[in-house]
Amino acid sequence: MTTSSPTTTTIAKAHGRFIRGSVSKVRRVLDQIRGRTYRDALIMLEFMPYRSTGPITKVLRSAVANAEHNLGLDPASLVIAQASADMGPSMKRYRPRAQGRAFAIKKQTCHISIAVAAQTDS
């Protein structure tokens, strides 16, 4: 049995569930902000031309508020440690088509998870 040194990094998390939008479109934005500081990520999200930046910004602000309120961390020193998007349930709708047929439409949802941690000076 090996013992590892305990890590005392404090991480604050936030989750957004059942967000309308496909997982691939949300992941391309999360890949851009992962590992960046909170301020840099907010600036990037503000000027990105994607619709998924709105819910991502909301979840990021919630994670920072959790770090500030629950752990007493300074928002200026926070960095995005983890950012992921998982597939949620699809809402099924039907569109009428020619000759009495029905065409299935899947409205996709996803779950967004963001974790922020205090920046280490190394």
UniProtKB/Swiss-Prot annotation:
GO CC list: cytosolic large ribosomal subunit
UniProt keyword terms in alphabetical order: Ribonucleoprotein, Ribosomal protein, RNA-binding, rRNA-binding
Membrane spanning residue stretches: none
Pfam families, sorted: Ribosomal_L22 (PF00237)
Entry-linked InterPro entries: Ribosomal_uL22 (IPR001063), Ribosomal_uL22_bac/chlpt-type (IPR005727), Ribosomal_uL22_bac/org-type (IPR047867), Ribosomal_uL22_CS (IPR018260), Ribosomal_uL22_sf (IPR036394)
UniProt record, GO biological process: translation
Molecular-function annotations in GO: rRNA binding; structural constituent of ribosome
Keyword field contains Ribonucleoprotein: yes
Subunit structure of this chain's protein: Part of the 50S ribosomal subunit.
Role noted for this protein: This protein binds specifically to 23S rRNA; its binding is stimulated by other ribosomal proteins, e.g. L4, L17, and L20. It is important during the early stages of 50S assembly. It makes multiple contacts with different domains of the 23S rRNA in the assembled 50S subunit and ribosome. The globular domain of the protein is located near the polypeptide exit tunnel on the outside of the subunit, while an extended beta-hairpin is found that lines the wall of the exit tunnel in the center of the 70S ribosome.
Protein family per UniProt: Belongs to the universal ribosomal protein uL22 family.
Record-given protein name: Large ribosomal subunit protein uL22
Lineage: Bacteria, Bacillati, Cyanobacteriota, Cyanophyceae, Synechococcales
